[in-house]
From Swiss-Prot:
Binds 1 zinc ion per subunit. This is 6-carboxy-5,6,7,8-tetrahydropterin synthase. Belongs to the PTPS family. QueD subfamily. GO terms for biological process: queuosine biosynthetic process. InterPro entries: 6-PTP_synth/QueD, 6-PTP_synth/QueD_sf. Zn(2+) binds at H14, H27, H29. Its cofactor is Zn(2+). Its EC number is 4.1.2.50. The active site is at C23 (proton acceptor), H68 (charge relay system), E130 (charge relay system).
């Protein structure tokens, strides 16, 4: 198995419904996403994947949906819609609280399989840094 990793950075805001400290309030992070993909063999050029393809597909999706957006729990739709209508702010809703864990799981299990379904590689690992010192891995 041969693995390759691509790093993507994006800025987004979120809040955690029901959290008992400051994370219950709207706040933002400079997220760093590391996507590790794997294949059994390289292609005829000796690559698992052209890193440009990962950039085009994964970073393209992240830029369109997450970058400079609010990532909210679908239970926060009232707040999200008010912010969106007053400011034009992009809002992305998750089924669960937008913790780093849930964002990483959403990307690995729901988004990336669809983005990469026609490719000869698969996503093995997602690492999402919420801060330079804190990350989750799925």
């Amino acid at each position: 198995m041969i693995k390759c990793t691509r790093r993507i950075e994006f800025d987004a805001g979120h809040r955690i419904i029901g959290h008992q400290n400051k994370c219950q309030y709207l706040h933002g992070h400079r997220y760093v996403l590391e996507i590790t993909i794997a294949a059994k063999n390289t292609d005829e050029l000796g690559m698992v994947v052209d890193f440009g393809l990962i950039k085009d597909l994964a970073k393209g999706w992240v830029d369109e949906n997450f970058d400079h957006s609010l990532i909210l729990h679908q239970g926060d739709k009232e707040i999200g819609q008010k912010i969106e209508s007053h400011t034009g702010q992009k809002v992305y809703y998750l089924k669960n609280n937008p913790t780093a864990e849930n964002i990483a799981l959403h990307l690995k299990n729901e988004i990336f399989p669809k983005l990469f379904e026609s490719q000869k590689f698969f996503v093995t690992n997602i690492k999402l840094f919420e801060t330079p010192n804190c990350f989750v891995e799925v």
